[in-house]
Amino acid sequence: MKKIILTIGCPGSGKSTWAREFIAKNPGFYNINRDDYRQSIMAHEERDEYKYTKKKEGIVTGMQFDTAKSILYGGDSVKGVIISDTNLNPERRLAWETFAKEYGWKVEHKVFDVPWTELVKRNSKRGTKAVPIDVLRSMYKSMREYLGLPVYNGTPGKPKAVIFDVDGTLAKMNGRGPYDLEKCDTDVINPMVVELSKMYALMGYQIVVVSGRESGTKEDPTKYYRMTRKWVEDIAGVPLVMQCQREQGDTRKDDVVKEEIFWKHIAPHFDVKLAIDDRTQVVEMWRRIGVECWQVASGDF
């Protein structure tokens, strides 16, 4: 049975590279790509010159299906076609499924699951093929949905809440390094962020503090948790209702730790409306899982 292979993945995830290599090793397969048609029908030199319209996209879709049909009817030497697009739109995948069913062909998915940080790095090096970061973020969200990973759409019926980070957000380090937690009680407040937390509390929001700080030492696994809580409540005066922190000995990246904390301890109990953070990797994590996030300062570290 002849195949229609749909690549599934964000821009920069390696779909086109894989298609080229696959076709080189598997005679009888052919590649059909929307971007190629977009560039061709408008006679553009570069792909980023293309301006999306419903009419032009309809033409591209028609060309894709007509080409696929012509190729697949091309005799026994033809084994299949690769549709090397993102294919993150469920309606487009359904259209190919329907098309294949009508003619008795088989649809397969080739999935390219690339971490967000790697996608951003690759996107920055793609030149005219790069997509705006908000577009990449939207596509990554669609990829999560395709993979069955959770995307946050609120928790109706639970208390509304705002999440605040500590280091670089509520607190500014005062003569210590980020891992010198023995001195974390000497931090100074970040006044406008602390005021914001109090304003939201007065408006009826629950304040949840989430920190990437390790919670303690081997000898005292909650030492830094207690020091942090005391600073947040007594020094900053933040009216928090919950504090979550990295477990002692957990060396994973901040965005991984905080996302896990969110799904396990926060999402089931609060209707989270906003997160306030400073570190870019964490800010992007909040946004890509569906939580609005305000970034306090430039934090690309």
Swiss-Prot record:
Cofactor(s) the protein requires to work: Mg(2+)
Membrane spanning residue stretches: none
UniProt keyword terms in alphabetical order: ATP-binding, DNA damage, DNA repair, Evasion of bacteria-mediated translation shutoff by virus, Host-virus interaction, Hydrolase, Kinase, Nucleotide-binding, Transferase
InterPro entries per the UniProt record, alphabetical: HAD-like_sf, HAD_PNKP, HAD_sf, P-loop_NTPase, PNKP_C_HAD
Reactions catalysed: a 5'-end dephospho-2'-deoxyribonucleoside-DNA + ATP = a 5'-end 5'-phospho-2'-deoxyribonucleoside-DNA + ADP + H(+); a 2'-deoxyribonucleoside 3'-phosphate + H2O = a 2'-deoxyribonucleoside + phosphate
Pfam families: AAA_33, HAD_PNKP
EC number, as in UniProt: 2.7.1.78, 3.1.3.34
GO molecular function: ATP binding; ATP-dependent polydeoxyribonucleotide 5'-hydroxyl-kinase activity; deoxynucleotide 3'-phosphatase activity
Field pH dependence: Optimum pH is 6.
GO biological process: DNA repair
The protein's assembly and partners: Homotetramer.
Protein function: Acts as a 5'-hydroxyl kinase, a 3'-phosphatase and a 2',3'-cyclic phosphodiesterase. Catalyzes the transfer of the terminal phosphate of ATP to the 5'-hydroxyl termini of ribo- and deoxyribonucleotides. In the presence of ADP the enzyme also catalyzes an exchange reaction. In the exchange reaction, an excess ADP causes the enzyme to transfer the 5' terminal phosphate from phosphorylated DNA to ADP. Involved in countering a host defense mechanism which activates T4-induced anticodon nuclease and shuts off viral translation.
Name this protein carries in UniProt: Polynucleotide kinase
Originating gene: pseT
